[in-house]
């Protein structure tokens, strides 16, 4: 995406005029300007320079009496499903943006683009061309919180080689390789290991000391700790603090962290700018609840064990542009480093659990995109994309409709209004987004403290709908800033299969709880309903609940399969 289209040009504009404008604004370009009648093309060295040119010039700079309009140059064949939305208010919440995008179709992917501008930029992929066309028509020029959105196509490489072009690919409709293809027939595909970086926030005045003369200090740190360190100097120009990302083993990250802390402490002492420099760790909000623990127990234990004082920034500071919380640790350098190890250990555990759940969802729900669901904002480096291939047979065949599931989710009674929205707008939008039926059951008693949300739809719809409900409750502050959203969910299982969910001596249900971190209860002495089904209760945070639900469905599928095999065997025996 390095090639730019420059529109709204005066007929008299020459390549030299454009070169001068780019040079005056210190925008790098490569090659010659190709000037046509009223428009031109030029290449930039990379995508970052292209974005900088768009932000600097488009609708802001005049040339020969006309305002330049600059966007990515996209060949007609590649104008398909991908668009870029610019000038998004930085404080805008994902929920609002997702709702706006969902009005024009199903969003497959929504990822944030790192830029130097104060406003946010996202790249969006819709399911088909028509949805994308509608989104451009309606969103370009749309006013949102005093910001006018700018929308344009970006290249969709898949459109050139995809089914819309009439070429047969080796992949099915959902992107999974066909069974028997070389990918699935051989050994399992190795997943690229994805590290979770240690991200620090450091005062801007100490960045120079950390880098050192001609980069000597930071080179020494990377060499000694076997790490890769990125100092994000250009982001948030003028900010009092800058982010540093450290990529290495946990031990390497901790060693680099200690060296950086020592450098900052020395610099503060030499310049007499501060008595102490606290350690500030950035962690994605998805992991912070589990770091804090129930009633703050995990965090208190870390404080006690390391003799430090730890505070975490407010949820109110989270925006579309900033999905991370700041964890501030105060104490001696030695103790701060011990706290860093404990904090990152908890964060990595939460990450691994979520990836396990995500991997499971990717296997059971091919094509599921978590960024589109809005649970893992794509700006987060902490979450890898779903596996590109799934070995073995798919749980349900691509030509068979996925099985409908009904799940009961219990929410605080006072949250019903937020889930329904004004004139029912939010629940309708949620239903469309997830492709699920979502209904709120009447209260069991006038003073009920919880209400039941009945969600009916296939696995992917369940994942999306439940994920949004968890997110909405957190966003609307129905749970405290240090409290993780944990909900009770009920699924019905055949009474004959309840024993398989429990296992001998409760072994299966105990393993299920250990694996998923959810509380799973099969109440004893239940009377089966008219369909000979009983309730299984699941209590936990979103990923724990999802993983438990999918594992239980997996057990039920095995029971059903064995039952069908048994019936088939009996039938064959009778024929003989």
Swiss-Prot record:
PTMs per UniProt: Phosphorylated by SRC at Tyr-396. This residue is involved in ACTB mRNA binding, its phosphorylation impairs association with ACTB mRNA and hence abolishes translational repression. Phosphorylation occurs in close proximity to filopodia and in the growth cones of differentiated neuroglioblastoma cells.
Compartment annotation: Nucleus; Cytoplasm; Cytoplasm, Perinuclear region; Cytoplasm, P-body
Consequence of substituting residue 396 to Q: Impairs the interaction with beta-actin mRNA and its translation repression
Keyword Repeat listed: yes
Keyword Repeat: yes
Stretches assigned to the RRM domain: 2-75, 81-156
Tissues expressing the protein: Expressed in neurons and embryonic fibroblasts (at protein level).
GO biological process: CRD-mediated mRNA stabilization; mRNA transport; negative regulation of translation; nervous system development; positive regulation of neuron projection development
Domain KH: residue ranges: 195-260, 276-343, 404-469, 486-552
Pfam families reported for this sequence: KH_1, RRM_1
A single GO cellular-component term on record: cytosol
Family: Belongs to the RRM IMP/VICKZ family.
Complexes and interactors: Can form homooligomers and heterooligomers with IGF2BP1 and IGF2BP3 in an RNA-dependent manner. Associates with the cytoskeleton, predominantly with actin filament bundles and occasionally with microtubules. In a heterologous system, interacts with ELAVL1, DHX9 and HNRNPU.
Record protein name field: Insulin-like growth factor 2 mRNA-binding protein 1
Organism: Gallus gallus (Chicken)
Gene, per the UniProt record: IGF2BP1
């Amino acid at each position: 995406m390095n090639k730019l289209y420059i529109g709204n040009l005066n007929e008299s504009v020459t390549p030299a005029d454009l070169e001068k404008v780019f040079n005056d604004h210190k925008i790098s370009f490569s090659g010659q300007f190709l000037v046509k009648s009223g428009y031109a093309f030029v290449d930039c060295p990379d995508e970052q320079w292209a974005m900088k040119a768009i932000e600097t010039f488009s609708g802001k700079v005049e040339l020969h009496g006309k305002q330049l309009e600059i966007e990515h140059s996209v060949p007609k064949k590649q104008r398909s499903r991908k668009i870029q939305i610019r000038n998004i208010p930085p404080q805008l919440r994902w929920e609002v943006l997702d709702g706006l995008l969902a009005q024009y179709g199903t969003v497959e992917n929504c990822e944030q683009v790192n830029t130097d501008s104060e406003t946010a930029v996202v790249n969006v992929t819709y399911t088909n061309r028509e949805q994308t066309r509608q989104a451009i028509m309606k969103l370009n020029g749309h006013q949102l919180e005093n910001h006018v959105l700018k929308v344009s196509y970006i290249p969709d490489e898949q459109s050139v080689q995809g089914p819309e072009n009439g070429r047969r690919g080796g992949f099915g409709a959902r992107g999974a390789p066909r069974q028997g293809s070389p990918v699935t027939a051989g050994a399992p595909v190795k997943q690229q290991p994805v590290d979770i970086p240690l991200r620090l926030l450091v005062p801007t005045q100490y960045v120079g000391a950390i880098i050192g003369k001609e980069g000597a200090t930071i080179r020494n740190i990377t060499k000694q700790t076997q790490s890769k360190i990125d100092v994000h100097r250009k982001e948030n120009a003028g900010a009092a603090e800058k982010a540093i990302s450290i990529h290495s083993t946990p031990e390497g990250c901790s060693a680099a962290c200690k060296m950086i802390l020592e450098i900052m402490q020395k610099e503060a002492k030499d310049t007499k700018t501060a008595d102490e420099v606290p350690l500030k760790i950035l962690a994605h909000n998805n992991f912070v609840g589990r770091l804090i623990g129930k009633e703050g127990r995990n965090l208190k234990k870390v404080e006690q064990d390391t003799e430090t004082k730890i505070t975490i920034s407010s949820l109110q500071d989270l925006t579309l542009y900033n999905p991370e919380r700041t964890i501030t640790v105060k104490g001696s350098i030695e103790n701060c480093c011990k706290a860093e190890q404990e904090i990152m250990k908890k964060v990595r555990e939460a990450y691994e659990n979520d990836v396990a759940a995500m991997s499971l969802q990717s296997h059971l729900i091919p094509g599921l995109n978590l960024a589109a669901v809005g649970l893992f904002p794509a700006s987060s480096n902490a979450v890898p994309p779903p596996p590109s291939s799934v070995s073995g047979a798919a749980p349900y065949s691509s030509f068979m409709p996925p099985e409908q599931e009904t799940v009961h989710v219990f929410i605080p009674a006072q949250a019903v209004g937020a889930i329904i929205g004004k004139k029912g707008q939010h629940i309708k939008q949620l239903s469309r987004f997830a492709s699920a039926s979502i209904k709120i059951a009447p209260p069991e008693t006038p003073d009920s403290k919880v209400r039941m949300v009945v969600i009916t739809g296939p696995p992917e719809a369940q994942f999306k709908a439940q994920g949004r409900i968890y997110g909405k409750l957190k966003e609307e502050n129905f749970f405290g800033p240090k409290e993780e959203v944990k909900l009770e969910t009920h699924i019905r299982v055949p009474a004959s299969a309840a024993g398989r969910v429990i296992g001998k001596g409760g072994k299966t249900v105990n393993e299920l709880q250990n694996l998923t971190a959810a509380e799973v209860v099969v109440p004893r002495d239940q009377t089966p309903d008219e369909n000979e089904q009983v309730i299984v209760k699941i209590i936990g945070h979103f990923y724990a609940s999802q993983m438990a639900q999918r594992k239980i469905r997996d057990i039920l599928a095995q029971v059903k399969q064995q039952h069908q095999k048994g019936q088939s065997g009996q039938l064959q025996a009778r024929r003989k």
